[in-house]
């Protein structure tokens, strides 16, 4: 589907021994280290979602201003204007979530909840914005002649890798419950 230039392949290690001095963490600590790395990489994935969404909005806006239907550019139709407005406000909200998650990471502050929020929200925004862009393009948006269909395919995979939308919601909920527990007792 999306991101065809980025191949993903499994790497399998069988009967591999790692000398103690080459361990990245203590024995049995690898999973924790890998999960901590996601707190740093998820905002980076989220910023990619924001970029996809912004590109889709720019293309859809330009197209809506040029495409004439019933004697006027489709950008003059209120339904299209509402779609463009919703796309813009959601992109800005996603961008701000990404900035917060990245800022926390830069400060060395635990950001599991914020990283998951940024990744989940930005990925969902990218999917919705690209779907709206395809809708604004109409039948042409579904073809490979216009880049919005590729952006939509690329947006879909971001909802899946580095943790699905459902996993992000679990991370968010668990962090909220931990925070509430700490403040109540």
Residue ranges and their predicted role:
Residues 10-15, 20, 26-29, 35-185:
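Alpha-helical interface subdomain recognition
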């Amino acid at each position: 589907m999306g991101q065809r230039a980025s191949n993903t392949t499994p790497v399998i290690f069988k009967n591999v021994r790692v000398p103690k001095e080459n361990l990245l963490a203590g024995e049995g600590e690898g999973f924790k280290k890998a999960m901590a790395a996601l707190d740093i990489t998820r905002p980076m994935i989220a910023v990619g979602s924001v970029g996809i969404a912004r590109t889709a909005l720019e293309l859809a806006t330009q197209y809506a201003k040029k495409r004439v239907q019933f004697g006027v550019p489709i950008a003059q139709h209120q339904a299209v204007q509402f779609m463009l407005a919703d796309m813009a406000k959601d992109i800005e909200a996603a961008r701000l979530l990404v900035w917060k998650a990245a800022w926390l990471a830069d400060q060395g502050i635990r950001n599991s909840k914020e990283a998951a929020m940024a990744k989940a929200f930005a990925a969902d925004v990218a999917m919705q914005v690209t779907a709206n862009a395809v809708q604004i393009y109409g039948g042409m948006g579904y073809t490979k002649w216009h880049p919005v269909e590729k952006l939509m395919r690329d947006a879909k995979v971001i909802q899946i890798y580095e943790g699905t939308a459902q996993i992000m919601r679990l991370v968010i909920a668990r962090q909220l419950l931990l925070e509430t527990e700490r403040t109540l007792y």
